[in-house]
Amino acid sequence: MLCCSASVKFSNGLQLSLLICACLLAVLIVSFCRRR
């Protein structure tokens, strides 16, 4: 979740959205791998 808190520092809405999407994807991948 560090990437999510770090992305808040960016003022650009587009960059913020992309970083949030990337962070969410990373969390989903990690949770999916842990299930296996």
Swiss-Prot record:
Keyword Transferase: no
Record has DNA-binding as a keyword: no
GO cellular component terms, semicolon-separated: host cell membrane; membrane
Keywords: Host membrane, Membrane, Transmembrane, Transmembrane helix
Bilayer topology: Single-pass membrane protein
Subcellular localization(s) per the UniProt record: Host membrane
Residues spanning the membrane: 13-33
Principal subcellular localization: host cell
Protein name: Protein P4
Native source organism of the sequence: Grapevine leafroll-associated virus 3 (isolate United States/NY1) (GLRaV-3)
